[in-house]
Amino acid sequence: PLAQYDLKGSDYVTLCDYSAIPVTISGDYDVTDQDVLDYVEKIFTQGGPFYTADPDKTTVEEGDIVNVDYVGKLDGEAFSGGTAEDQNIDVSNNSSTSGSGYIDGFTDGLIGASVGDVIDSNVTFPDEYPNNPDLAGKEVVFTFTVNSIQKEVTMDTMDDEFASKQFGADSVDGVYKQVRQYLESSAESTHKNDVYSALEDYLLENCTVDMPADYRSDVIEAIRANFIDRYCSGDESQMETVLSSYGYTEESIEQEWSDSVESSIRLELIVKAIAEKEDIQIDDTEFEDYVSTIVSSGGFGDADTLYSNYGYGDYVYGKNQIRVIYLAGLVLDKLAETAEITENAVEETTESVESTESADSTEE
């Protein structure tokens, strides 16, 4: 079993000098006012359209977006899936503003209605209605409550009330503040990931590892068995066909597995060796919190499923691997404190420069 390979790093690793690792990273880690404006614009162009009540409109006309509550009834009884609240409906296109279409005639009764009206609309479901066969061909009554007639909101017309309702911000300025915080957090995370990736590359290149061959071959075999179980229904004879559908041969995938496993084991042993030398310990409570976060964000259901997944079916080995990942974070935290970090600004590509010059040449 893979669980036997809970190895001591210092038995296999000759460490390099990691007291002041030189790291060079390239990226745009600063957030400008323009970045914030661009992101808010992206929210409205890609996440919209957004709407709010138009106090100047009281009667529904063709082309309007109407906010309604509705209840659908068959023979006087509300039916499943026929009730909704706070729905924005495009009356001209007989659809929701998200683009979902309604059955023919659904919005016909709304034209001419006033805000505050409660109206009944008789609608017949199509003879074939796979979403709910019990309603196929049936005449039903939808009772609409007209809450408001809507108007579109853009980033320029957004007000504090809309900012609160749509984005949970206390004001329009609060929306921009939220976006800046998000972008700065993302930039900080990217910066950290770039530094840690460079630190890992340095350690792999400069530390010497005596590769435990049995460990390496057993992990590769476990990956292979797991692949056959998950993607070939346990039938090894299907492996060639399945791999070809992904553009692989058995030789190419096994080479990829081999390279990946070797790099992973080397980094695992280096991390352990540094942790042993620096007496970096895992706090069990903090580790449990870390595991809970992974389980929740990764949709694993519970820790046992997480461990089994990372251990290729071996629960104990999987838990050990998660501990190694967590330990690696602690080790890299320490190395980053003393690393000599050089940040290179991202250079404009030749194409973008030429594009700008071309655009400038057309201006008068």
Predicted regions and their residues:
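FKBP-type peptidyl-prolyl cis-trans isomerases
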Residues: 1-364
